[in-house]
């Protein structure tokens, strides 16, 4: 009798497979209600990237061979300010304007509204995503208080003669972005550039290049902040500078954003689910804002973000704004879902009834 019951249960389970498939196939791809805003952010991002590319070329930096899309945000594999390893494919993908659309989507899903203040922590490892968040804030009419770091992994914004704060300044002077960074740090270990290649290799020429970069930034009014209060105090100072915020965005792996432990990695990507992490002296901004109930958007694992949102990963050609899956959600037939659940319920009740009749017989 037990074997017969298991057989019936197995048959019901098998019957449900095509039913679930039917639900998926009858689902419709529906454009998100704020897709026009997403598309506007993506088009602004395209303008910003074009301005940055033009300034990069003006400064004598040719595009790297790895930049197949010729967008101009990819740096060298290694430079004086390189701090860590990075994926060529991820860096190439992170230049796409779809990430500006994604930032708008996540901010809407986080409940952010025009006029709200948001905070952000940007690593130079993903300049395209940093600029994408700024474009989203610009289009949505948000007040954004943010910090940028200079150290970068492979193929990020690691050209000492044209670093991330200067890219933002280029867009600002072109009238494309209205808000400059509130805080600029060296990034890398200790948020002080301790693991930059120039210092690790004790290369005098590269160190001199960094010193020239620092002097140039000061001349441009992009002043570096050198923290020395200790990690926890530095994080709390960063939070105080941002004030009350409706959401926090972390791009890349800056130590103050991620914390001086591996804990933040466990909370996932994109718009994070509410969590209550245990806060300690080494907790970064991601954990601390999660603990306060502030929505956190974490943009680091580019491949995973693409898989989850429909942005093409490492495409051969540049996608047009408004086309990719990030602008859509799937709407499933309520009738089909209802029929499947009703059928499953009837089948389960039938199995129970047959089993009871067998026992009574």
Please name every model-derived segment.
Residues 9-26, 343-346:
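Hydrophobic membrane-insertion alpha-helices, especially the h-region
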Residues 81-98, 212-226:
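Acidic/glycine-enriched edge-of-secondary-structure segments
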Residues 162-248:
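A substrate-binding/cap region within the structured catalytic cores of diverse enzymes
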Residues 98, 104-110, 114-163:
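Membrane-embedded segments
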Residues 19-34, 351-357:
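Membrane-interface motif at the C-terminal end of an N-terminal transmembrane signal
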Residues 129-136, 259-267:
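Short Gly/Thr/Asp-enriched flexible loops that form oxyanion-binding sites at enzyme active sites
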Residues 247, 254, 261-361:
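C-terminal functional extensions of proteins
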Residues 39-96:
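N-terminal, Lys/Arg-enriched amphipathic/low-complexity engagement segments
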């Amino acid at each position: 009798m037990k074997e017969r019951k298991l057989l019936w249960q197995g048959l019901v389970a098998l019957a449900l497979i095509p039913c679930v498939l039917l639900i998926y196939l009858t689902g419709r791809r529906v454009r998100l209600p704020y897709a026009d805003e997403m598309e506007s952010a993506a088009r602004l991002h395209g303008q910003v990237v074009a301005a940055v590319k033009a300034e990069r070329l003006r400064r004598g930096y040719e595009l790297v061979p790895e930049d197949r899309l010729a967008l101009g945000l990819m740096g060298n594999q290694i430079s004086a300010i390189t701090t860590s390893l990075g994926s060529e494919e991820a860096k190439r993908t992170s230049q796409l304007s779809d990430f500006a659309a994604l930032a708008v989507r996540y901010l809407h899903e986080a409940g952010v509204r025009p006029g709200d203040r948001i905070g952000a922590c940007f690593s130079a490892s993903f300049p395209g995503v940093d600029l994408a968040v700024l474009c989203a804030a610009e289009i949505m009419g948000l007040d954004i208080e943010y910090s940028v770091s200079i150290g970068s992994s492979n193929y990020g914004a690691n050209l000492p003669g044209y670093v991330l704060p200067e890219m933002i300044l280029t867009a600002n002077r072109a009238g494309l972005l209205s808000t400059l960074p509130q805080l600029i740090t060296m990034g890398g270990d200790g948020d002080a550039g301790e693991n930059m290649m120039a210092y690790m290799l004790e290369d005098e020429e590269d160190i001199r290049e960094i010193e020239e970069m620092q002097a140039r930034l000061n001349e441009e009014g992009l002043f570096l902040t050198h923290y020395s209060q200790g990690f926890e105090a530095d994080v709390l100072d960063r939070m105080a500078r941002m004030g009350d915020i409706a959401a926090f965005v972390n791009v890349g792996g800056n130590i103050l954003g991620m914390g001086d432990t591996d804990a933040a990695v466990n909370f996932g990507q994109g718009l994070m689910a509410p969590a209550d992490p245990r806060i300690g002296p080494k907790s970064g901004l991601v954990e601390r804002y999660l603990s306060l109930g502030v929505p956190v958007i974490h943009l680091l694992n580019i491949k995973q973000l693409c898989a989850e949102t429909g942005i093409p990963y490492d495409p051969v050609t540049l996608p047009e704004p408004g086309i990719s899956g990030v602008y859509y959600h799937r709407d499933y037939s309520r009738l089909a879902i209802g029929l499947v659940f009703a059928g499953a319920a009837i089948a389960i009740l039938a199995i129970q009834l047959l089993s009871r009749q067998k026992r009574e017989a």
